Each structure stands twice: as C-alpha cells, then as structure tokens.
Amino acid sequence: MDIDKLREEIKYDEGSVNKIYLDHLGLPTFGIGHLVLESDPEHGWEVGTDVSEDRCIEAFNSDIENVLSDCHRLYPDFDDLPEEVQRIVANMMFNMGRPRLSKFKGMKRGVDAKDWNAAADEMVDSRWYRQVTKRADRLVERMRN
C-alpha cells in the first residue's frame, strides 16, 4: 500500500491543527486527528494550547502504525486486499478505531467475500455514515468502484 497516499487522504479528511481542540464528540484532540490519550504528555492541557509541528507528526506517525496493526488484526488477509480497499479500511480505522469498526460485521463479510457493493451498502447503513457524511460518501463511492 502507498502509505504516503493514505497519509494524504487521512490528513485531508481529518485536517491538521497544531493545538489542542475538541473534536466533533467533544474530546481533546490535536494535530491530524490525534485523540489525546492519558499516556500523552498533552493529557490535561487546556483547549487552545499550542502543540509543536514535530509532536503532531510524531503522533500521526504513531497513529498510522497503530491503524495498520489494527487493520491486520481485523482483516488477517489485509495485505491481499486491493490497495484501494486497504486505504478505505485504514481510513475508517483511523476515524473510528478497532472497537467501533469491528462492529461493521456486514461490511467485513462484504470485504471478505470481495463483494465491494455489499461492503459499501453496509458502510451506508451506519451511524458513522450519518456522522461524517462527506468523508463517508467519498469512501463509499471508492468502495463501489
């Protein structure tokens, strides 16, 4: 998979903010959609506090590694999927995390069967789709093609 292309797509969807902000769920976040964890040095920082570009990149790199690891856990044949499907699944994994994406059982059945339309239909039939409609529309369209 072209990791640079994945990184560009996620950066486009997430945006990049070099300070602590609240995401659409009201959770502290910084950089390229990095949810502040208790283990992060930024934990407890006030909204609006600046975060260095280097730290934002470091967090994004770590997040991408975790996303790809989670993709392989959820889809053991992840490397054998078409690259476009790999990037779609990875984008969704970045956005939702493995606990939520693992609940997309119909989508997983579609991907496992290489039935891209069935997988796309299951993507649409979700709360995630209603929450991030523009992003979801792009990913669904790509899955269908």
Task: Annotate each PLM feature.
Residues 1-19, 25-26, 34-36, 51, ...:
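Long, amphipathic alpha-helical surface segments
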Residues 18-21, 73-84, 122:
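Surface-exposed patches in mature extracellular/periplasmic domains of secreted proteins
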Residues 30:
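Conserved functional hotspot residues at active sites or interaction interfaces
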Residues 43-75, 83-90, 94-101:
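Alpha-helical segment that forms one wall of the substrate-binding/catalytic cleft
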